[in-house]
């Protein structure tokens, strides 16, 4: 069924709003993936705070115009499934990467983060970004490690001073 002009404008506006509030975007080709599997992917995406939609390339080009995802324009070929991460920058990339492992026909095309185009081969850069909680945990571990090391060095320095004085 052909879309009317009003429907097209509504789609462009909806995707544009999603793009403006998103932290990152990933696009993929879902040809050959069954409806059941796509339904599971959509449900998982909603749970992960990822906006996901299949959009015509011409409408997608208009929707990302003026956003930091304009760099993806050259990758809009063939059927395009776009996902915007709303809560964590790596959420959509991680979701698509896991789904692609289980579904051979699902192909990640590209991604974008902070206006930078990320080719499909480097999508791991985006997928492996730590979540806020993981980053805080790593920071705390580093700080704890540093303070323990500093304590050991301080005690060793005090011991050396006492030995030198004796």
From Swiss-Prot:
InterPro entries noted in UniProt: Ribosomal_uL10 (IPR001790), Ribosomal_uL10-like_sf (IPR043141), Ribosomal_uL10_bac (IPR022973), Ribosomal_uL10_bac_type (IPR047865), Ribosomal_uL10_CS_bac (IPR002363)
Any Pfam family: Ribosomal_L10
Keyword Ribonucleoprotein carried by entry: yes
GO cellular component: large ribosomal subunit
Listed PROSITE patterns: RIBOSOMAL_L10 (PS01109)
Keywords: Ribonucleoprotein, Ribosomal protein, RNA-binding, rRNA-binding
One annotated GO molecular function: structural constituent of ribosome
CDD domains the UniProt entry points to: Ribosomal_L10
Membership in a protein family: Belongs to the universal ribosomal protein uL10 family.
Protein name: Large ribosomal subunit protein uL10
